[in-house]
Amino acid sequence: MKTILVTGCSSGFGREIARYFLERDWKVVATMRKPQEKLLPASDRLRIIELDVTDAASIDRVVAAAGPVDVPVNNAGIGMLNALEGTAMDSAREVFETNTLGTIAMTRALVPQMRERRDGVIVNVTSTVTLRPLHLLSVYTASKAAVNAFSDSLALELAPFDIRVRVVLPGRAPDTRFGENAKPRMAAGFPEAYAGIAKDVFAQWKQESTITRPMQVAEAVWLAATDPGSPAHMPAGDDAVALAAAG
């Protein structure tokens, strides 16, 4: 029985990924900053563990507690929506610490055991904003684009050890907490000069009916984890697939 470790399982994509694999008889290590047992169906194959991907000691504790992991899924992330002028450097660093360096740190901690076994799949969840630039997402996009580049280079590095690396790119997902967890980093102030741009952007988002559902992301992660022939970059969601196809 294989084991998947998923970061950021308190809501959205992470919770659905954990549930999806649990239903398919995998062992699941679901991690989150504030563990809540009731978020996922009770199972003797499920472990819910506290994890802060920006804290080295927290990562070490989780890796030690999890045991052998076949598929780590780096899904934990925080949102950032603001004009660059309105973005405090502390907020920008916070986004990169979680979205980018957190992914690198988790991967670095798990690679040794995978290399020794000469087996495994690393799945990094990024975003289709890396395929098409959008207003007011410059810092967030940069944090996710860095993970794409990291993944592509890492795939070459780990191929001799039979470890695959895959990137799953979801589209817009209003059912997740992206907007909610972006608000604290907007609280410092949104520049008045960009108010018109923001109004137009939000209006456009409301008009878009094609979105990404958490189940579609879970399905893409499943394909990445179980199909050796899966592509290195996998859009997830109707809008994501359409965007990737448009080039």
Name what the model sees in each region:
Residues A83-L84, S91-R93:
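Substrate-binding pocket helix/loop in short-chain dehydrogenase/reductase
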Residues P160-S230:
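SDR active-site lid
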Residues T107-R108, D152:
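A short, exposed helix-loop element centered on a Lys and neighboring polar residues
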Residues T107, S143-A146:
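Active-site helix of classical SDR
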Residues E85, R132-S138:
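Active-site loop immediately N-terminal to the catalytic Tyr-X3-Lys motif
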Residues S127:
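Residue(s) in the substrate-gating loop at a strand-loop-helix junction
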Residues S10, G14, A18:
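N-terminal Rossmann NAD(P)H-binding glycine-rich loop of SDR-like oxidoreductase domains
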